[in-house]
Amino acid sequence: MAPQLLSSSNFKSLFDSVDTFLFDCDGVIWKGETLIDGVSQTLDLIRSKGKNVVFVTNNSVKSRRQYAEKFRSLGVTSITQDEIFSSSFAAAMYLKVNNFPKDKKVYVIGGEGVLEELQIAGFTGLGGPEDGEKKAQWKSNSLFEHDKSVGAVVVGLDPNINYYKLQYGTLCVRENPGCLFIATNRDAVGHMTDLQEWPGAGCMVAAMCGSTEREPIVVGKPSTFMMDFLLQKFGTETSRMCMVGDRLDTDILFGQNAGCKTLLVLTGVTSESNLLDKGNKIEPDYYTSTVSDIIKLMESP
């Protein structure tokens, strides 16, 4: 069925059929450090109608705590970290539910958010931002040393990725017996600033795939791994959830894989022409220009 433009004729049936709205963040709630117009009022209005509001982001640079701080800094003060599910959190939870040995370490190609979530889960993380200035040099009769106790390499969005990190992660995956290769997500690009799209974690993951000749375990969207935690917290059926996102291949596919209703907004990486292109195979149930359209539709007679 072709995606429906959200309108006064179909909005009420969608809203009444949903208990929990799942929102992506980049390109939906904000662009870089700029809140998208009308978002705060929309979230308050949805909550006032007795609905749950949850945030499911593939951006692993921040931890849940840091995302809650970002919401507050942008003037959205009602959000707690328990309502935020990030791919940094998902990476730590994947290790926890799979009984990753506490005596093994985790090498991180990514941001502080992954390291913080690993620490909260009881794991020892290495790498991250502190390896951003290190250099790998080719020297005759010299070995690049790496920690043999690393049992997992987590790769996420890393604005400071370099050759040192790639070599370190590659050696761990290829030479440490049983070492896991985990990707927070494979987004090609993202709205890291308000005016432009920037290379996403998919670029870093692709580099590691090339050097290790391995495919990663992906814990972020469109994988439904995080959905298990959402169901535990809210105890509602996925059919009573609606995923609101700006990406077809992550947000909308995640919602479809989990059995949720799906709503695409056009404030992020997907344009209306992308959506309606005959070559597009991923179609949301509904689409609209921006999240704040919900206010107008809710107030319409």
Curated annotation (Swiss-Prot):
It catalyses: 2-phosphoglycolate + H2O = glycolate + phosphate. Transmembrane segments: none annotated. One of its GO terms (cellular component) is chloroplast. InterPro entries: HAD-like_sf, HAD-SF_hydro_IIA, HAD_sf, PGP_euk. The keyword Hydrolase applies. Disruption phenotype: No visible phenotype. Its EC number is 3.1.3.18. SUPFAM superfamilies: HAD-like (SSF56784). GO terms for molecular function: phosphoglycolate phosphatase activity; protein serine/threonine kinase activity. Gene3D superfamilies: HAD superfamily/HAD-like. Keywords: Hydrolase. Dephosphorylates 2-phosphoglycolate, but does not contribute to photorespiratory metabolism. This is Phosphoglycolate phosphatase 2. It comes from Arabidopsis thaliana.
